[in-house]
Amino acid sequence: MMQDATDPAVRAALQSQPSGLNSTDDWRQVMDRIMSLTARNPDAFRQQPQANRLSAILEAVVPARANPTHEKVLAIVNALAENRAIRPDEAGLVYDALLQRVARYNSGNVQTNLDRLVGDVREAVAQRERAQQQGNLGSMVALNAFLSTQPANVPRGQEDYTNFVSALRLMVTETPQSEVYQSGPDYFFQTSRQGLQTVNLSQAFKNLQGLWGVRAPTGDRATVSSLLTPNSRLLLLLIAPFTDSGSVSRDTYLGHLLTLYREAIGQAHVDEHTFQEITSVSRALGQEDTGSLEATLNYLLTNRRQKIPSLHSLNSEEERILRYVQQSVSLNLMRDGVTPSVALDMTARNMEPGMYASNRPFINRLMDYLHRAAAVNPEYFTNAILNPHWLPPPGFYTGGFEVPEGNDGFLWDDIDDSVFSPQPQTLLELQQREQAEAALRKESFRRPSSLSDLGAAAPRSDASSPFPSLIGSFTSTRTTRPRLLGEEEYLNNSLLQPQREKNLPPAFPNNGIESLVDKMSRWKTYAQEHRDVPGPRPPTRRQRHDRQRGLVWEDDDSADDSSVLDLGGSGNPFAHLRPRLGRMF
C-alpha cells in the first residue's frame, strides 16, 4: 500500500480526482465538517465577519481542488534523477523549465481564460445587436399592428399592393433614425435622417386605397393627380428608393410616380449641357463679359462665392534654398560657360539629399519655373539669377507660371505706329507730293561737288520724306563717304513709300486700275536698274605742295579719308600707313 502511495502515477491519479460532492460522499460527513467549524467556540465563529463565515462554509461543503501539476513534475524529475538521466545538481533547473513549459502550453488557467474571453465576445456582440435592433423591433411591432388593420386583399393591383407593403417593411427595417409609433387611432412613420419628416400611415393608405392598379391616360393625368394628398406624396417619395421597376408596375399611375421620384433622387450629377445653355442665354441677353459670366455660372452651378486669393510668401528655409540655387547657377554659368538648362541640372545634382528630401515640392517647382524662364526669356532668367533680392511672382505659388516674353530687339519695336497711319490727302496735295518726289529723284543723280552741297541737299528732302527725324540724324553725323546719298534707294523702297489714297472721289471710276498701272510702271527689270545706276568716277590725282621746300608731287597711292571710309572696294584702305615719298616736278 505504501508502494502504491509513493508511485507518481498513482499519486497523480488520486490527486486528479474531482472534489466536492459525488455519489460516494455522505451528507453526514459534510454536516460534520460544517459543524466542526463551530464546535470549539461557536460564539467566536458567530462574531466573525459574514464574508469569512460564508467562505469557510463554502470551503467545508466544496473543498478547493489542489493543483497536482507541481507534484507530477516533481515525480518526473525524481524518476529522471533515480534513472541517472540527469545529475542531482541539474534537477532544480529541469524542474523549473518543465513548470514554465507546462504553464505556457498546457495551463488550465489559460484555457479557461480563453473560454471566458470567447463567451464575453459573444455576449458583447449579442448585446450590440439587441441594442441596435431595439428601436427597429419596436417599430416593426407597431408596423405589424398597423398592417393588421389594413385589408389583405384589394380589388385591383394586388401584386403592386403586396410589393408596396414589402417595400414599406424594408424601409422601416433599414432606415436609421426612424420609427413607427401609434398616436391615438392613427399610426405614424417618423424619420430624422435628413430633416424631421412625419407621415400619417393611416391617412396615406386610406388615400391610396382606391388607386391601386389604376392606369391613368397618358395625355390627361391631372384628374388622378388631384386625388393624392401631400401626405400620400411624401410617403411615395420616402419609399421610392426601396422600390424598383419590377416591384410596382410602371403602367399604373402610382408606379409612374414612384419611377419619377426614384430617378429624381438618384440623379446626383450636374447636366453637362447646363454650361452651354446658360452661356447661350447670357449671350442672347447681351452679356458678353466672360468674367461676370463665369462668376454667375460658378454661383449657379456650385453655389460657391469667389474668395480673395491669399498672399503667399517664402519661409526662411525656402528663401535659403532659393539663394543657394541662385549662387550655384550663377557660378556654373560664369565659371564653366554652360547653358542655363545645364547649369540648373548641375545645381540639382550637387544638392544635398537630405535638404532635397525635406523640401521636395518646393525645389521641384522652383526648378521647373527656372527652366521655363530660361526657355521663354533668357534675359528675365539672368536677372532673376543675378538679383540677390529676387522673389518668385504670385503665379509661382498657384501653379500658373507667368514668365514675361523677351524683347528680340527688332527695329519695328521702337518705331511709332503713327508714321504708317494713313492721313487724309486731297488731290492737289497728291500732285504736289508727286512733283516733289520726281524733282528729288532728278537731284539724286547729280553728284554733289563738296560737302557743303551734300549738307545743303539734305534739308530739301526733309519736307517730302516720311521720316524727317531719320534724315536729320543722317545729315547731322560727320561722314566723308563719297556715295553717302541713299535717297534714291530710300524713295524707291515700296515698304517705306508714303501710303497713297486708295479711295479717291467718285470722279475717278477706274481708280483701282490706275493704281495698278502706276505700280506696274514703277517696276524695273534688272537691266534697267543696272543701266540707271551711275558709274564710278575715275580716280583724280591730287597734288601736294611743300611750301617750305618748294616741292610738288602727285600722290598716287596715298588714300584720303574718303577712300578709307569707302567700303565699296576701290583703292587701298591701308595706303595711308605706307611711308610718303614725294617726286619733284
Swiss-Prot record:
Oligomer status and interactors: Interacts with hexon proteins; this interaction tethers the peripentonal hexons to hexons situated in the facet. Interacts with the penton protein (via N-terminus). Interacts with packaging protein 3; this interaction is required to promote correct genome packaging.
Expression induction or repression: Expressed in the late phase of the viral replicative cycle.
Pfam family of the protein (one): Hex_IIIa
Phosphoserine, modified sites: 225, 310, 444, 449-450, 452, 469, 473, 494, 515
InterPro entries on file: Hex_IIIa, Hex_IIIa_N
Keyword Ribonucleoprotein attached: no
Propiece residues: 571-585
Record keywords: Capsid decoration protein, Capsid protein, Host nucleus, Late protein, Phosphoprotein, Viral genome packaging, Viral release from host cell, Virion
Region (Disordered): 1-24, 438-475, 528-573
Location of the region described as Binding to hexon-linking protein in the Swiss-Prot/TrEMBL record: 138-251
Record Gene3D superfamilies: Pre-hexon-linking protein IIIa
Residues covered by region (Peripentonal hexon-tethering domain): 1-106
Job description of the protein: Structural component of the virion that acts as a cement protein on the capsid exterior which mediates the interactions between the hexons, including the peripentonal hexons, and reaches all the way to the penton vertices. Two hexon linking proteins IIIa, one from each facet, stabilize the unique edge interface between a pair of facets. As the virus enters the host cell, hexon linking proteins IIIa are shed concomitant with virion acidification in the endosome.
Family: Belongs to the adenoviridae hexon-linking protein IIIa family.
Modified residue annotations for Phosphotyrosine: 490
UniProt PTM comment: Cleaved near the C-terminus by the viral protease during virion maturation to form the mature protein.
Phosphothreonine: residues carrying this PTM: 274
Compositionally biased intervals (Polar residues): 14-24, 462-475
Keyword match Lipoprotein: no
Note in the entry: All late proteins expressed from the major late promoter are produced by alternative splicing and alternative polyadenylation of the same gene giving rise to non-overlapping ORFs. A leader sequence is present in the N-terminus of all these mRNAs and is recognized by the viral shutoff protein to provide expression although conventional translation via ribosome scanning from the cap has been shut off in the host cell.
Protein name per its UniProtKB record: Pre-hexon-linking protein IIIa
Gene Ontology CC, one term: viral capsid, decoration
Residues marked Cleavage (site): 570-571
Cell location: Virion; Host nucleus
